[in-house]
Amino acid sequence: MVTVKSVFCGEELILETGLLAKQAHGSVTLRLGNTTILATVVAAKEPNLESDFFPLTVNYNEKYYAGGKIPGGFFKREAKPRDKEILISRIIDRPLRPLFPEGFRNEVQIIPTVLSVDTDMPTDALALIASSAALTISWIPFGGPVAAVRIGYKNGEYIINPKNSELSTSELDIIVAGSKDAILMIEGEAKEVSEEVFIGAIELAHKEMQKYIDMQNEMASLCGTQKIEQELFEFDADLVKMVTEYGRDKIESANYNPDKTKRNESMDNAFNEIEEYIKTKVEDEKLISQVKGICHSIEEEIVREAIVEKCMRPDGRALDEIRPITTMTNLIPRVHGSALFTRGQTQCLSIVTLGSEKDAQLMDDIYGKENKTFMLHYNFPPFSVGEVGRYGAPGRREIGHGNLAERSFNAVLPPKDKFPYTIRVVAEILESNGSSSMATICASTMSLLSAGVPLNASVAGIAMGLATYKDGYKILTDIQGVEDHLGDMDFKVAGTRKGITAFQLDIKLTGISAQILKEALEQAKKARYFILDKIDATIANAGEISDFAPKYKTMDVNPEKIRVLIGPGGKNIKAIIEETGSDVEIQDSGVVNIFAPDTPTLDKTIKLINSYVKDPEVGEVYDGIVKDIKDFGAFVEILPGVEGLCHISELAYKHVMNVEEVLKIGDEVKVKILDVKGGKYSLSRKALLEKPADYVEEEYNKKEKKHGKKRF
């Protein structure tokens, strides 16, 4: 067994191999305090040279036993991956993928498994380190090692590898992955931090991760790792020359078109024409199958060369130019809030629904349970790109894009005591030509304001790109689909006028420098301000809450009355909920939150709650029920368990000889409180009637009223 050690978050970090999962091609167990992660990697022995992509799969998984828990549900076992597991799988995949050799077509599967967990320690960076170590000691060709470090920021100081308890108050939560020389991946959110703070965190993280890269190299040296040369896919050199000579000009002429559909049609026609020509020169079907791949490589070179050397983008924009933007709000009836954001040929329809506390999503994992009251779901149907495709449950990409957009708003959402609604945002991508996740953020800002959500600030997002060619590079603002596909970087930045709120960096190179990121951030800031101007011109402040949204009221109740409101076994509060259909949340502090489907129901719910918790006061009017009748008056229940006396002289303006001339037991009667003494209530029906013009109170009524008997 081989073991290497370092320090992580002030604790001993151990990487070991040779004990667990020895049949895997690479197996590393990471230990940090009570956290244990087993990362395994296996690769197919033979390449699939007919594949046009590298088949890498990462399946990060958390076992419930790691946190000493039994899964919920009927089957009591782990099932499909939870969103969190998918998101961490993506965090691991993204920095590792660029470091495999170009043309490597062996299928690779990485499975990091959390075996035990310290619930105050995030596992994503650790799982990435373990996965990289497993690759590094395996026979699989890999240009690593890679390491990851999380950085927090509080009170003007950075926190290296903060724990979960520290992240709750941190202004920054950024995870940075990199190699010895460059940055490979960035992911996280912030509370409107500046670009300077952001870059400082990246530079600190890259410096800190070097020791985790060194320990992986040490482990590989101790294991005596030898990489096995694999057959890499390469295009036939003579065929490349033939396709280039005949087809480069055709591909270049098809490249420049501001319309995505027309450009794709022109490019497809060029590819097909080139393939038909090659068929007249070549009979080998395997060679012919390479033609379109070669055409695609030529297209990539043309796009990069034009951008870097001529500052020409495929759609004719300047390098820092944003596509035309149009915005609309409140275009969908009946929903609680809606907005449409269109940027070029990317279009997002965002819909907001407001709900009560019971609509919150219960998050249950190895770290415990919590209620999630803000959700943003991103949908990317195949028609958005003019294709027929799978339609159903969200895939990994949709979950990742939705999570990024959701995190963009965490810094600007109103506190629960001011806006206690559960908020669900659904982003429907209706057209896509790149940067759809950033369009989601822009559309969702407007739909949230449209729904009456008082955001602390508007949020906008922009996707920055990078094109490299020979020794040069150019940074692109607002990349479209072809620039994302053929370029080297997709750097998504979201934020307000004050600062950055969320970010995500993916690259196809073996790393980029902090200087390139600085330049990209500066351009992104200008673009963000431009888009925020467009949003503010459409809707700058929160509107009125929709008539179709639940109505909300907070009541402050004497904590001593809470038991009365709840009742034995919850009898009273259940009766209120059943009668009104409202959602009522009661806190021990006496705060009662009420959500009702409409205003009349809300008023009724408040009235019923007051019937248990409010002390009646002089002058108030109640709808009561006659409980008992005596010669001198009627006892009327005005609140549950609270009765008052309506004296016979207070039944009517006319002389009443017998109480039952006016009231009978069980009658409903509206009464007004005349007096409260020692917890006894004097009531009047007469006070709510119209007084006759010739009425004169009789003396015997005064005397009888004064000396009448009372029952309490």
Swiss-Prot record:
The name this protein goes by in its record: Polyribonucleotide nucleotidyltransferase
Record domain S1 motif: where: 619-686
Domain KH: 550-609
Binding site for Mg(2+): D484, D490
GO molecular function, one term: 3'-5'-RNA exonuclease activity
HAMAP family: PNPase (MF_01595)
General function of this protein: Involved in mRNA degradation. Catalyzes the phosphorolysis of single-stranded polyribonucleotides processively in the 3'- to 5'-direction.
Heme recorded as keyword: no
One Gene Ontology CC term in the entry: cytosol
Protein family membership: Belongs to the polyribonucleotide nucleotidyltransferase family.
Subcellular location: Cytoplasm
Cofactor(s) recorded in Swiss-Prot or TrEMBL: Mg(2+)
Provenance organism: Brachyspira hyodysenteriae (strain ATCC 49526 / WA1)
Listed PANTHER family: POLYRIBONUCLEOTIDE NUCLEOTIDYLTRANSFERASE, POLYRIBONUCLEOTIDE NUCLEOTIDYLTRANSFERASE 1, MITOCHONDRIAL
Enzyme Commission designation: 2.7.7.8
First-level EC class: transferase
Enzymatic reactions: RNA(n+1) + phosphate = RNA(n) + a ribonucleoside 5'-diphosphate
GO biological process: mRNA catabolic process; RNA processing
Keywords linked to the UniProt accession: Cytoplasm, Magnesium, Metal-binding, Nucleotidyltransferase, RNA-binding, Transferase
